[in-house]
Amino acid sequence: MNVVKDLLKSGKTVIGTAGSAFGDMAMLADTGFDFLLFDTQHAPVETKQLIPALQSMRGKKAAPVVRVSSNRADLICFALDAGARGIIVPMVNTKEEAVAMVRACKYFPLGDRSNSGVRGDWGEYNPDMMRDGMTSEAYRSYLDMVNEELLIIPMIETQQAIDNIDDILSVPGIDVLLVGPSDLSIELGVPVDYPSDTYQRGLDTIAAACRNHGVVPGMYFIPPGMDPNFYVDKGFKFFTVPWARWAAEGVQNGLAGIKR
């Protein structure tokens, strides 16, 4: 149901790219990426603006993943209702914040997410479903499936989070611990100096803790000039890469082969 979770469970590297709120994402969602990431923290968009893009991805290969702007239950709930199959929350620094995130993502009894009917790729919303014969047991089965399939991704971006990493990773339900590369480098006193020993030691600490807890470490993006395989070799199996340059190269190669 959620291809990203299946890939992570099998130990594969999961690669995504940035999605846009202002366009039909159907084509990009079927190019081979495992997920499209929609940002509402730094991008000038609100979750409600993502609805057409998320709906255009229905039935496509890539899973829609949304980064909300903060660790608020209402923002998380609305992003999920809009069709997200994964949630990223920035600046998760403590176990308590991780617990709050997970509970906002999951339905009772694993969480506190409010229910508004069958949503997204898990089914069509139909307010008459109970009257028309959907049993209570079947509805419970749907809720349990969503709880199981949803991708939950807190971000680690501060020294405080590194200090609390074992407590954070002890929270059940976390699938990926996602490094915010630039913010973490600033916190470690080496702003955007990604090759520095200090920064790399921080990444090694994160990767080791994730291994110990059975959680996949990821990078929000691969820093400019760095080889993605460098991070894969460290154990980071979830990240985004830019697609525009690859698309431009493909167009250029295609045009170059035509007599003009």
Language-model-detected regions and their locations in the chain:
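Catalytic cores of alpha/beta
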Residues: 26-30, 66, 71-85, 89, ...
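Histidine/lysine/aspartate-rich catalytic loop segments that bind and position anionic ligands
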Residues: 172-192
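Alpha-helix-loop-beta-strand connector modules within alpha/beta enzyme cores
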Residues: 47-81, 104-111, 145-147, 195-218
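Conserved N-terminal beta1-alpha1 strand-loop-helix module at the mouth
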Residues: 1-64, 70-71, 103, 152, ...
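Conserved anion-binding
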Residues: 74, 86-172
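C-terminal helical cap(s) of enzyme catalytic domains, especially alpha/beta-barrels
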Residues: 53, 57, 95-111, 244-260
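N-terminal amphipathic alpha-helix/helix-capping segment at the start of soluble metabolic enzymes
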Residues: 1-18, 132-148, 204-206, 211-212
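Hydrophobic faces of well-ordered beta-strands that scaffold small-molecule active sites
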Residues: 14-19, 36-38, 64-68, 87-89, ...
